[in-house]
Swiss-Prot record:
Family statement: Belongs to the HpcH/HpaI aldolase family. KDGluc aldolase subfamily.
Pathway named in the protein's UniProt entry: Carbohydrate acid metabolism; galactarate degradation; D-glycerate from galactarate: step 2/3
InterPro entries: Aldolase/citrate-lyase_domain, GarL, HpcH-HpaI_aldolase, Pyrv/PenolPyrv_kinase-like_dom, Pyrv_kinase-like_dom_sf
Highest taxon above the source species: Bacteria
Pfam family, one: HpcH_HpaI
Site (Increases basicity of active site His): D89
Name of the protein this chain belongs to: 5-keto-4-deoxy-D-glucarate aldolase
Function: Catalyzes the reversible retro-aldol cleavage of both 5-keto-4-deoxy-D-glucarate and 2-keto-3-deoxy-D-glucarate to pyruvate and tartronic semialdehyde.
Catalytic activity from the UniProt record: 5-dehydro-4-deoxy-D-glucarate = 2-hydroxy-3-oxopropanoate + pyruvate; 2-dehydro-3-deoxy-D-glucarate = 2-hydroxy-3-oxopropanoate + pyruvate
Residues reported to bind Mg(2+): E153, D179
GO cellular component: cytoplasm
HAMAP family, alphabetized: KDGluc_aldolase
Enzyme active site: H50
Length: 256
């Protein structure tokens, strides 16, 4: 089949601690998402938390990535089983779960993506993810091929990082630098030494549990530093940021 869904190559790459360079997709456009997919990134976050995305906007973007080597990762707006189920049914296999603070919340995210008895995912026999009922052994294969990445972006999450990283079914730990900075009383200043030290601590604890860690780092120097610290999957920019910067540069070239 074209763009075969199993095995999940992104999940395997994370398990093997292979560096994965990604990009954020926030414009909710299948055209810009397709352009990102052609650029050669290993993975793309289709953001459902801070971008204007929902089921109706995400399906065309998944279609736009069909045949691309870039793995689509959906950031859901919240750690809620029904929302996660809907993302599963439209064809996502890689999940970024925001604001996870405890082992119980991490386990809830994992359970939301697994069919019983391993989890609590609701059963539909025909949907986009199983190619409308044509994927053999979809139920068992799906349970084994879902990627769960949890975001740590609060002090409580930092305090519980060991328990979260040790949660069965969690494939990776992702740092939300902006929210983490705010939680540490450095709103708008993720480069503050306290924030950077905490990021390094999270990376170290994830590594101690054999879990890859990731982060969003649109500044090249930051991205390279995080890679040196052991980050495995790093989003190095966004479609919105690239578009804004390039159009501003173009306008400035002729208007100033």
């Amino acid at each position: 089949m074209n763009n075969a869904i199993f095995p999940n190559k992104f999940k395997a790459a994370l398990a093997a601690q292979q560096v994965q360079i990604g990009c954020w997709s926030a414009l909710a456009s299948p055209i810009t998402t397709e352009v990102l997919g052609l650029a050669g990134f290993d993975w793309l976050v289709l953001d459902g938390e801070h971008a204007p995305n929902d089921v109706t906007t995400l399906i065309p973007q998944l279609m736009a990535l069909k045949g691309s080597a870039s793995a689509p990762v959906v950031r859901v707006p919240t750690n809620e089983p029904v929302i996660i189920k809907r993302m599963l049914d439209i064809g996502f296999y890689n999940f970024l779960i925001p604001f996870v603070e405890t082992q119980e919340e991490a386990a809830r995210a994992v359970a939301s993506t697994r069919y019983p008895p391993e989890g609590i995912r609701g059963v539909s026999v025909s949907h986009r993810a199983n190619m409308f009922g044509t994927v053999p052994d979809y139920f068992a294969q799906s349970n084994k091929n879902i990627t769960i990445i949890v975001q740590i972006e609060s002090q409580l999450g930092v305090d519980n990082v060991d328990a979260i990283a040790a949660t069965e079914g969690v494939d990776g730990i992702f740092v939300g630098p902006s929210d983490l900075a705010a939680a540490l009383s450095h709103l708008g200043n993720a480069s503050h030494p306290d924030v950077q030290q905490t990021i390094q601590h999270i990376f170290a604890r994830a590594k101690a549990h054999g879990k890859p860690c990731g982060i969003l780092a649109p500044v090249e120097a930051d991205a390279r530093r995080y890679l040196e610290w052991g980050a495995t999957f790093v989003a190095v920019g966004s479609d919105l940021g690239a578009f804004r910067a390039s159009t501003q540069k173009l306008a400035d070239t002729f208007k100033k």
